[in-house]
Amino acid sequence: MSIVILDFGSQFTRLITRRFRELGAYSVILPGTASLERIQQENPQGIVLSGGPSSVYDEGAPRPAPGVLDLNVPILGVCYGMQYLAHEAGGDVKRAGKREYGKADLTEYGGRLFEGIQGEFVAWMSHSDSVTQLPQGYQVVARTEHTPVTAIENNDTRRYGVQFHPEVVHTPKGGQMLANFLDICGVTRDWNAEHIVDELIEGVRAQVGDTGRVLLGISGGVDSSTLALLLAKAVGERLTAVFIDHGLLRLGEREQVEAALTPLGVNLVTVDAKDEFLGQLAGVSDPEQKRKIIGREFIRAFERETAKLGDFEFLAQGTLYPDVIESAGGEGAANIKSHHNVGGLPDDVQFKLVEPFRTLFKDEVREIARLLGLPDHIRMRHPFPGPGLAIRCLGEVTAEKVDILQRVDDIFISGLREFGLYDGCSQALAVLTPIQSVGVMGDERTYSYTAALRAVTTDDFMTAEWARLPYDFLATMSNRIVNQVHEINRVVYDITGKPPATIEWE
């Protein structure tokens, strides 16, 4: 049983799902036009109609399939969803006299959605249409200065609507509203990592059977490492995890992965392909070309190794729920594409996919990793790009430059951990620039590389702020780097947000 969120195009739809799961309720996102049969497959205890950019009067405006609003479950409409509920029930929706974007104070509020909430209520508004005439059976339960109909409810039909976003952090008490909706739906809040680990293991066993062999391409990141542990528990030696060392890893990463996974029962095969990757990258400076070469070489190395290992019926992938959401078009699951941890696979490779994490978010995978015993230094590690240090080494990639960058990166990341700053950053990295400049070391002139340090904070990686690291810490890092990595004589810190910059430099 679940809460089904019908997505009508809001940028915040994913947050609704996350908030419900944080409250202990399983929830799924389906296209706003999903069929009644598809929705009923989820056995919903409640439905949320998301916001979106459309107007209910637009030609071709998205709307739920026939019969959805007749289901005998509570329904919550958010922004466009509220307008649609009101419109379909016979109310009026018109272009607002004054648009509301950003924070607004509710001048009054009440009703079941607001039960237990007291004091000031700040809401995040984003709408150009408003409900101007209530449908029969509804009552207004919240207002702002400029929006007299900010929240509505019909307790007889259990239909509720809000003209703001309770799911965003800018609505501080929105979480309590969503919790109240779960109570209205009668949801048992038992969605947690402990509850689902056994289900995931049993699901893999049911799919693979008693004899099926499973192949996993492992990157060393939290998703594939956690998946390796889960599969090892599910099928034991019938799992083979292939870890390709392309020579573009962080310092000591190969050894860390082997030390973390092998003692926990993962049948791990490590492939040393450094020479092949660096050989193909020689003379290449364009970042997109570097990515393509690395993806191609991953395929080749993976094919060479798997040919030695015998036949596999199943290929496991660490696909997460955001991948599924982003890949689903209006037709729903039929348009979902595969996401390959190994950089892509040939079209003619015939595997059955095993994707236990396809309904999970990253934070849920991290919690499963904790339960399965994955060491914290891997479980809580910052994101690392598939092409590795190749896209943090600007210009041509050589073994010498990778060695320099590995040492700089290790000093920076180790320093963040030492000073207690690592967990406060969402991602931190070092970049080796092709810029060389004059410096003085001792009494001698130097002409060496410039290293750039970057750290950001973000909730979703769609936008990011540069991390305000202490000056004393940055000074310490600069001093350590130029003294321990003699090929570097200048260190800079990137203070650009996203946008306009991306988090990675290439």
From Swiss-Prot:
SUPFAM superfamilies: Adenine nucleotide alpha hydrolases-like (SSF52402), Class I glutamine amidotransferase-like (SSF52317), GMP synthetase C-terminal dimerisation domain (SSF54810). It holds the Pfam family GMP_synt_C. CDD domains: GATase1_GMP_Synthase (cd01742), GMP_synthase_C (cd01997). The active site is at residues 79, 165, 167. InterPro entries: Class_I_gatase-like, GATASE, GMP_synth_C, GMP_synth_GATase, GMP_synthase, GMPS_ATP_PPase_dom, NAD/GMP_synthase, Rossmann-like_a/b/a_fold. Keywords: ATP-binding, Glutamine amidotransferase, GMP biosynthesis, Ligase, Nucleotide-binding, Purine biosynthesis. GO terms for biological process: GMP biosynthetic process. The keyword Chloroplast does not apply. PROSITE patterns: GATASE_TYPE_1, GMPS_ATP_PPASE. Residues 191-381 form the GMPS ATP-PPase domain. This is GMP synthase [glutamine-hydrolyzing]. The gene is guaA.
